[in-house]
Amino acid sequence: MERAIFAGGCFWCMVQPFEEQAGILSVRSGYTGGHLPNPSYEQVCAKTTGHTEAVEIIFDPKQIAYKDLVELYWAQTDPTDAFGQFEDRGDNYRPVIYYTTERQKEIAEQSKANLQASGRFDQPIVTTIEPAEPFYLAEDYHQGFYKKNPKRYAQSSAIRHQFLEENWS
């Protein structure tokens, strides 16, 4: 089994696309990249911890390749926005691919270069690629949010889905 960590704005919106793929064993919402151990949602939202909202994915590389996860990640984000994603603004929502191995780093960097060269976007691809840091699990009410609160999830993800439809379909 391997581990992947992606930050792409609100973690509620990052779970379902990965969870629906064959070879995914778990997708958990949490916080990473900051300086405060075991932060709470309120602390991360206060923008003083340095953490981003992210998802940790445990996957079987025999069933789904890391490269495919990176491609799926791009299609969930606006890779030209370094200051958050969609209606969620600030460092705690910035887009980051966290790599856990040098091979993941190489794959992510090549994928980013390919996306930039594709001309899909008029602006530079600004998503950062950074070494993984400790991942702190978010509170239970955040886990599987799209299943627990489908109406609220639909409302909170509407702007994201419109962008994805216009730019990734």
Curated annotation (Swiss-Prot):
It is an enzyme of class 1 (oxidoreductase). One of its GO terms (biological process) is protein modification process. InterPro entries: Met_Sox_Rdtase_MsrA_dom, Met_Sox_Rdtase_MsrA_sf. The gene is msrA. Keywords: Oxidoreductase. NCBIfam families: msrA (TIGR00401). It catalyses: L-methionyl-[protein] + [thioredoxin]-disulfide + H2O = L-methionyl-(S)-S-oxide-[protein] + [thioredoxin]-dithiol; [thioredoxin]-disulfide + L-methionine + H2O = L-methionine (S)-S-oxide + [thioredoxin]-dithiol. Belongs to the MsrA Met sulfoxide reductase family. Has an important function as a repair enzyme for proteins that have been inactivated by oxidation. Catalyzes the reversible oxidation-reduction of methionine sulfoxide in proteins to methionine. It comes from the Bacteria. This is Peptide methionine sulfoxide reductase MsrA. Its EC number is 1.8.4.11. GO terms for molecular function: L-methionine:thioredoxin-disulfide S-oxidoreductase activity; peptide-methionine (S)-S-oxide reductase activity.
